[in-house]
Curated annotation (Swiss-Prot):
Pfam families: HHH_7, HTH_44, SH2_2, SPT6_acidic, Spt6_S1, Tex_central_region, YqgF
Keywords assigned by UniProt, alphabetized: Chromosome, Nucleus, Phosphoprotein, SH2 domain, Transcription
Basic and acidic residues bias locations: 1-12, 180-192
Compositional bias per record (Acidic residues), positions renumbered to this chain: 29-51, 88-100, 153-162, 194-211
Record-given protein name: Transcription elongation factor SPT6
InterPro entries: RNaseH-like_sf, RuvA_2-like, SH2, SH2_dom_sf, Spt6-like_S1, Spt6_acidic_N_dom, Spt6_death-like, Spt6_HHH
Region Disordered: start-end pairs: 1-217
Family (UniProt): Belongs to the SPT6 family.
Record-linked PANTHER family: TRANSCRIPTION ELONGATION FACTOR SPT6 (PTHR10145:SF6)
Primary residence: nucleus
């Protein structure tokens, strides 16, 4: 709808949705939900002040340099450009490629078109004479690019919104697509747009007569001329202001001349860009002039060029027709892609073997088809340079099984193949080096020759095997290597000294002993490799090893003087070098490596530092006593091994890799390789000799291979963790814009709020309004206190006014602390109370928005540039609102450092910066290409254009180059094919990116635009499939083959697309097509597998660019808790001990807060006041911090219930999230270390304790032993008070019960003023006392009295238990019919008595225990105050037990 001169703006609440059910439209801003009219701004008349606009435009166009330019220079420039065009032909599409592309796109090319270097359309017959004029006009048009760019820079949309359904697509927000209609266009006579009018093909508008056609063309020209007269209206500035801006900022093209030089030098190697330098010949004194090429590095600082990606390397990446990410990965690979057919086959098998691990195929699964898919993927990546998103979207049938339920190579698999391809090329380079090295030695070694013959197996293609070969050559052929070095360099003297000692040994007579061992290292390798004794060892017929070596020493005493007096040294030397030969044998190493990799186990061995530092709650707690961890463990939990490696680097532990039965394994290898079956003494001696050497060799091999496996395991675990990080990040990116009402799916207008630190009434509440396009409209500062009870309506009215003014469809909120939750509930209350709804009567949802991007944005350089005068909280709210519109674009606009700083995964710190960056970038690439980018919107919207670098084939440099190329066009793109015809993209990058760069189809604009625009350009259908899409449309419409053939011949197949989109029954017609049969027929005729492409075509014809992302995810429950508090399930959980600060008292409850500002409640039963029967405010102080135990967490209200009781605080519950299964956890070692640590802590505590001084006559600075020594000479009942080993809140009374018998009584102190002061409350045996004297009088003296009463009783016997037992037995024999009982002291448990008795001489002797208390004698659950009562009670108990026994016997 367009506004006429006397029309009025429609109020926002009266606006109507136009064409709600128009499903035929392709992606446009309307579908993003933008309103047609903007009530916050007024449209300006496009014809206003034309004279002023003309002045401004003239100011843009006039260029003094152009006016003063010499005509010859202009001709020279044309020639250079012509040369450049010729040199670019190699990078561009060939004529056949272009013909095919144009045919698929539905455009005919004639021979004249094919021969045109600029790929223009054919001219009409009467217009050939204007060709030269048009060509020259292009130069003038290109000079006006800078003018149009400045006009684009200052242009802004006058309308805020358009009506229309959002249609759930990716067109997140940015600028209205109508901006592109209003973009300023160059209108010089003979300009590029005038040319396009003359290049309409004959079959277009064939029914028009010449007069009608000319009138139509003139109308178009008139419209364009009018659009030029708008610069002041577009910018909203006067010409004086615009001139002033030019004076200050320039036009942004001051250095185009330098870039032009650089581009020419890169593209066509023009030698004109050279500067002469003069040099003086030192010998002759003559002056010589030399030429030096001028580059950007001669003009700018290298660091600035690197920062702006403009070094020579960057410019080369820009211009090379290979995806940028591939160029970066392949930078270190020489001669990439030139592999032999054998290496290509090996790569396919090698990569298939690695990828198949994740596919969990059955053991008998036929991998032929899978390897074919892997081979296809490798070909697409290495030969065709197609990036992962393109392969997954448009070549999926080539990377999947033909069976419906078969395998599919996922995007993860394809990215793995990309990395593995680089790894394999590096391996091939190393292999080629070793081969050249081997060839130059001019030797024939069977081991090396066999290795290179068998290199077509995947297991051979490992770097470790190749390293074995190289080490073997260095070890065995050191002399030959030295000779080769001398021959190559002409220098004498040995350079290769690595194995010089072995060479000396091999040249000595002692080496003869190695031959007498009876089997060479090569034969041992053959035996072990075949697991059979192919070459049995031969024992010396007559001599033992010692005798053989002694005979050699005697025969060569002159040459072996060092060994003559030391036979043992000679034996050790022979064993050493024989074991060295064994350890270097490649077949032995390969067999051991293969077995070790399958069956290794990993153990953790703690260092002293690790035992001390790895405690509960430590990052490495779960690996402290890890043992017997298998490869499967680490595949399931890769972070576990990475933590082991990290802890090892910190010297906390060492990771030991070993085989489960390593000793038995070594014995087995020895038996099949070196052991003879002879039983003679000589044979036994030689077996022992060989075994010692073999064990030495195996120790060395296991040491090397263990390190290799550890390195490989580290790399594989890093890949697995990186993949997990990538998936977690993809869930963040894979969110569609927030849609408040699914029945009205439009991008919402957003009001975002934050209460900052939550100091209500003191700090302002900030609100920000952002419209549907993501434009910041205004911010609000609310100074009213939302919790002011005296005038609550004031805040409510303010909020209501803001909402009525903005008419938002959704409200987003977040903040730095839990007070935001209180504010959130208040907002809900206000909206409900005042029944606030949006302009369409819908409820306005309030959601918590993820603020990790907003936190980084508010203080970023980007925010300072966008909103220099706004405070951080306003910028924070802007980012919240933008996040609701597009999480993807918010993340895409972060810098690489900011992205890496995101907390994505708990183990991302285990990855290197490069690994983390690659994982995050591939996630970006997958999601951005799922969504795609609208080309014309990206041209003048930097925020939206940030996603371009992740488009398939692009990167940071190519995205910059792409945008610059688009801006130089100075007009919107009308068709994808223009990316090729306008030389914006070359063949490979176009193929990669075209399907993910779309051009919005807008019906309103069609009558003004060139007919080159194709409706399929606004779909996910790739241009290579346009012709296929038109055939699908024709078949769906059920046209007969003759009509289809006629349209195909005329090049008007695209009409079927338009007809289908207008057909109301198109869904039923498309869904009725048998795509499987069609795909089979297509493959049979063309060899192309297109079933997935056909499915994509049908979906896109039904609903172009349907939203494929997941719904927006507002924060919920524990996510809100974590966002507002910063606490996680590992730092704040039920049972955790946390510090809390007392804020206030409520009745007898205590209100506290944690460091993260979580409000905690201590009810009256969970603090010491309940036990002491005192109010809480007498025991606890406001502002003071106390340890507390979390009892319950209320995530919804962000509160918790905690306990301050001592017994709760001392019993912290720490959940164990790892297994302590004895098979994988060293429980025995854990217990031993715990006991050792306890003893050590006790010893350290005793050594470091400060001696307390208690002002009491019985207090002595003794320990337990010293107290006993002091009392040993004292009387019974004497005592001392001393320190306790339990800590400064305990004391001990040590008192003497009898000779060498002492009791230590614990006194617990409460309510201490300081650690060394005496507590105000003292507890002994659960009884409370006020001071030490009270304990002495009421407790200790009573026990002494009762002890004396017992020892004075006739029923007490002194002496040991053995003595008393003997006395009772003797008494019972003398008096067989009498019962007997006596008490005695329990020397094992001071403070207890034995009660021993016999019923008669024939009964057994019974022993009961009696406890001495301060109130009596405790026997069988009863306390007796005197000895007499104790004896009577004992007799009563005895009679009762006897009666029960008789009753039981009777029954």
């Amino acid at each position: 709808m367009e506004e006429t001169g006397d029309s009025k703006l429609v109020p926002r609440d009266e606006e109507e949705i136009v064409n709600d059910n128009d499903e035929t439209k392709a992606p446009s801003e309307e579908e993003e939900g933008e309103d047609v009219f903007d009530s916050s701004e007024e449209d300006e008349d496009i014809d206003e002040d034309e004279d002023e606009a003309r002045k401004v435009q003239e100011g843009f166009i006039v260029n003094d340099d152009d006016e003063n330019e010499d005509p010859g220079t202009s001709i020279s420039k044309k020639r250079r450009k012509h040369k450049r065009r010729e040199r670019e032909e190699d990078d561009r599409l060939s004529e056949d490629d272009l013909d095919l592309l144009m045919e698929n796109a539905g455009v005919e090319r004639t021979k004249a078109s094919s021969s045109s270097g600029k790929f223009k359309r054919l001219k009409r017959v009467g217009d050939e004479g204007n060709a030269a004029e048009s060509e020259s006009d292009n130069v003038a048009a290109s000079r006006q690019d800078s003018t149009s760019k400045l006009e684009d820079f200052f242009s802004e949309d006058e309308e805020e919104e358009e009506s229309g359904l959002r249609n759930g697509r990716n067109n997140e927000y940015g600028r209205d697509e109508e901006d592109h209609e209003n973009r300023n266009r160059t209108a010089d006579k003979g300009g590029i747009l005038d040319e396009l009018d003359d290049f309409i093909e004959d079959d277009e508008f064939s029914d028009e007569d010449d007069e009608t056609r000319q009138r139509r063309i003139q109308e178009k020209k008139l419209l364009r001329e009018q659009s030029i007269k708008q610069p002041t209206q577009i910018t909203g500035l006067s010409s004086d202001k615009i001139d002033e801006m030019y004076d200050i900022f320039g036009d942004g093209h001051d250095y185009d001349w330098a870039l032009e030089i650089e581009n020419e030098e890169l593209e066509n190697g023009n030698d004109n860009n050279e500067a002469e330098e003069e040099e003086i010949d030192e010998e002759t004194g003559a002056i010589k002039s030399t030429k030096k090429k001028i580059s950007l590095q001669d003009i700018y600082d290298l660091e600035d060029l690197k920062k702006n990606l403009m070094t020579e390397g960057d410019m080369k990446i820009r211009k090379t027709d290979i995806p940028e990410r591939y160029q970066e990965l392949r930078a270190g690979i020489t001669d990439y892609g030139n592999m032999s057919s054998e290496d290509q086959e090996l790569e396919r098998n090698w990569i298939a073997e690695k990828i198949s691990v994740d596919k969990n195929f059955d053991a008998n699964y036929d991998l032929t088809e899978f390897k074919e898919a892997i081979g296809n993927a490798i070909k697409f990546i290495t030969k065709e340079n197609l990036e992962v998103p393109f392969i997954y979207a448009y070549r999926r049938n080539y990377i999947s099984s033909r069976e419906k339920d078969g395998f599919l190579l996922t995007e993860d698999d394809l990215w793995d193949i990309v990395s593995l391809d680089i790894e394999f090329h590096s391996l091939v380079n190393k292999k080629d080096y070793v081969q050249r090295f081997y060839a130059e030695l001019h030797i024939d070694d069977p081991i090396v020759t066999e290795y290179f013959k068998n290199q077509n197996t995947a297991s051979i293609a490992e770097l470790n095997s190749l390293q074995d070969i190289y080490d073997y050559l260095e070890f065995k052929y050191a002399n030959e290597i030295n000779e080769m070095f001398i021959n190559h360099t002409g220098k004498t003297g040995k350079k290769h000294l690595k194995n010089s000692s072995y060479e000396k040994f091999k040249a000595s007579p002692l080496y003869q002993a190695v031959s007498d061992i009876g089997i060479s290292a090569e034969d041992v390798g053959e035996n072990i490799s075949s697991q059979h004794q192919i070459h049995p060892p031969v024992d010396h017929p007559s001599s033992k090893p010692v005798e053989v070596i002694e005979s050699i020493l005697n025969a060569n005493s002159g040459d072996l003087q060092v060994f003559t007096s030391n036979t043992k040294l000679a034996i050790d030397t022979v064993q050493k070098y024989y074991s060295l030969e064994l350890s270097k044998n490649t077949k032995i190493r390969e067999k051991v490596r293969s077995d070790f990799s399958k069956y290794y186990l990993a153990d953790v061995v703690l260092t002293a530092k690790g035992k001390k530092e790895i405690q509960k709650g430590s990052l490495y707690e779960d690996i402290k006593y890890a043992i017997n961890r298998t490869p499967m463990h680490f595949r399931r939990d890769p972070d576990v091994f990475l933590k082991m490696v990290e802890a090892e680097s910190l010297n906390l532990l060492s990771v030991k890799l070993h085989m489960s039965s390593q000793a038995q394994y070594i014995e087995h290898l020895f038996q099949i390789a070196l052991e003879t079956t002879n039983t003679s003494d000589i044979a036994i001696e030689w077996n022992n000799f060989r075994k010692l050497a073999f064990n030495q060799a195996m120790d060395k091999i296991f040491q090397d291979i263990s390190q290799e496996v550890k390195d490989n395991l580290t790399k594989n675990c890093q890949k697995l963790v990186a993949k997990t990080v990538r998936h977690k990040f993809m869930t963040k990116l894979d969110q569609a814009p927030f849609i408040p009402n699914v029945r009205d799916p439009k991008i919402p207008k957003i009001l975002s709020l934050t209460c900052g630190q939550g100091r209500f009434g003191a700090d302002a509440i900030i609100a920000v309004y952002v419209n549907r396009k993501g434009d910041f409209i205004r911010d609000y500062k609310i100074v009213d206190n939302p919790f002011d009870k005296t005038n609550p309506e004031k805040f409510e009215d303010t909020l209501d006014n803001i909402i009525q003014s903005c008419q938002p469809n959704a409200i987003g909120i977040n903040g730095p602390n839990p007070k935001t939750q209180k504010f959130y509930k208040r907002l809900q209350e206000v909206l409900h109370k005042k029944q606030i709804v949006d302009s369409r009567g819908h409820t306005i949802p309030i959601i918590y928005v993820e603020d990790e991007v907003a936190i980084r944005y508010q203080n970023s350089e980007r925010a300072a540039q966008e909103f220099p005068n706004k405070p951080p909280l306003v910028k924070y709210c802007i980012a919240l609102a933008r996040y609701m519109h597009s999480p993807l674009l918010e993340y895409a606009n972060l810098t690489s450092e900011e992205v890496r700083s995101l907390s994505i995964h708990p183990h991302q710190n285990l990855l290197s910066s490069e690994q983390l960056s690659w994982a995050l970038e591939t996630a970006f690439v997958d999601i951005v290409n799922l969504v795609s980018v609208e080309v014309n919107k990206a041209t003048d919207n930097n925020y939206y254009a940030s996603a371009l670098k992740y488009i398939s084939g692009f990167g940071k440099r190519k995205a910059i180059d792409f945008l610059q190329s688009l801006q130089r066009l100075n007009e919107p793109l009308l068709a994808r094919q223009q990316l090729i015809t306008h030389n914006i993209l070359h063949k490979t990058i176009f193929m990669n990116s075209a399907g993910f760069l779309y051009i919005s189809w807008n019906e309103k604009r069609q009558k003004y635009e060139d007919l080159e625009h194709d409706q399929l350009d606004s779909t996910r259908i790739h241009p290579e499939d346009y012709h296929l899409a038109t055939k699908v449309a024709a078949d769906a419409l059920e046209y007969d083959p003759d009509t289809i053939a006629e349209k195909e011949e005329q090049g008007t197949m695209s009409e079927f697309i338009e007809l289908l989109r207008e057909d109301p029954d198109r869904r039923a017609k498309l869904e009725s097509l048998n795509l499987e049969s069609y795909a089979e027929e297509l493959e049979k005729n063309t060899g192309l597998r297109k079933l997935n492409n056909l499915n994509t075509i049908v979906l896109e014809l039904l609903d172009g660019f349907e939203e494929l992302r997941n719904d927006f995810h507002p924060l919920q429950g524990d996510e809100i808790f974590q966002s507002l508090t910063g606490e996680s399930e590992k730092t704040f959980f039920k049972g955790s001990i946390i510090p809390v600060r007392v804020e206030r008292f409520w009745h007898n409850d205590i209100i506290c807060t944690t460091n993260s500002e979580v409000e905690c409640v201590v009810n009256a039963q969970r603090h010491a006041g309940a036990q002491l029967r005192r109010p809480a405010n007498e025991i606890y102080e406001i502002g003071k911090t106390y340890p507390a135990k979390v009892i319950y967490i209320d995530y919804a209200n962000i509160t918790a219930e905690v306990s301050l009781l001592d017994h709760d605080v001392k019993q912290q519950y720490v959940p164990i999230s790892y297994s302590k299964d004895p098979s994988i956890w060293d429980l025995k070692q854990e217990l031993e270390d715990a006991e050792e640590e306890r003893k050590l802590m006790m010893a350290e505590a005793r050594a470091k304790r400060t001696h307390r001084v208690i002002n009491h006559p019985y207090y002595f600075p003794f320990n337990g032993r010293q107290a006993e020594d002091y009392l040993r000479s004292k009387e019974r009942g004497e005592f001392v008070i001393r320190q306790s080993s339990r800590g400064d809140d305990h004391l001990v009374i040590t008192w003497k019960l009898d000779k060498d018998l002492f009791q230590h009584i614990d006194i617990q102190e409460l309510e201490k003023e300081n650690p060394l002061a005496l507590g105000k409350v003292l507890i002994v045996d659960n009884q409370k006392y006020n001071d030490l004297d009270q304990i002495i009088v009421e407790y200790l003296q009573n026990k002494v009295r009762l002890l004396n009463e017992m020892t004075s009783s006739e029923k007490f016997k002194s002496g040991t238990k053995k003595d008393v037992v003997k006395f009772i037995e003797d008494y019972s024999r003398v008096n067989p019919n009498k019962s007997v009982y006596y008490f005695s002291l329990n020397h094992d448990n001071p403070g207890w008595f034995y009660l021993m008795f016999k019923i008669n001489a024939n009964s057994k002797l019974y022993t009961w225990n009696v406890k001495l208390t301060n109130t009596g004698y405790f026997l069988v659950n009863y306390n007796y105050p005197s000895v007499i009562q104790l004896c009577n009670g004992f007799k009563t108990l005895l009679k009762s037990n006897s009666s029960k026994n008789r009753m039981n016997n009777y029954r």
